[in-house]
Amino acid sequence: MSEKSGNGNNIKIILLGESGVGKTNLINVSTGRNFEQNSISSNQSSFFEESLEYNNKKYIYNLWDTAGQEIYRSLNKIFLKGSKIVICVYAIDNRPSFQELEYWINSAKEILGDEDQYIRAIVANKSDLFEEQAVPDNEGRQLAEKHKIKFCVTSALCDAEGFKKFLHELIIDYINLIGPEGENALNFKLCEKKPEKEKKKKFC
């Protein structure tokens, strides 16, 4: 594998969502760790570093796990800063976790601002619990279409490779977003897009 790092190195990816939706296990299985059957809900944020090679360049990415309990929401907004990819997770057997997705999507927008600067996605986790499904897949897909973001149905227990593939697609989307010149070029383009305020005409 090439040791040359690409522009946009150290890509911060954050998983948001209610407690118990499986964010920790999604990170575990996508980083080669074991699925924890009796996983305890996270009460703090942590991250794992991984890498991806794309177009002969090596990109480092950090997967951030966050606590979903309401008492930690203000902290999660702090951890959102600097994120380049935001993944909002709900569990298909937990309708309240789906209903809270708007909060998480809006939190990202509040902290990160212009949606052209980062990649967003919705992940429906625990597809293995189809017999207990409380949120039809089409509802998740419709919400993703509403916000013009990607959508994935997966299971940390049964579909580790599927989620990892989706994760890599998001990373490649971000790499293509910033282009060969990196984040500075992206920021320049965004500045160009903002219309200049018309100068007031002065009359003598």
Tell me what each language-model feature is:
Residues 1-24, 28-33, 51-58, 112-204:
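Conserved P-loop small GTPase signature centered on TRAFAC-class small GTPases
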Residues 32-40:
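Post-Walker A helix-loop "phosphate-sensing" segment adjacent to the P-loop in P-loop NTPases
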Residues 59-76:
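Switch II (G3) loop of P-loop NTPases
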Residues 63, 89, 123:
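Generic enzyme active-site microenvironment
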Residues 67, 92-93, 127:
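Conserved Walker B
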Residues 70, 96, 130-131:
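Short, solvent-exposed loop/turn segments at secondary-structure junctions
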Residues 72-95, 101, 111:
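Inter-motif core of Ras-like GTPase G domains
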Residues 102-106:
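Generic structural signal for well-ordered alpha-helices
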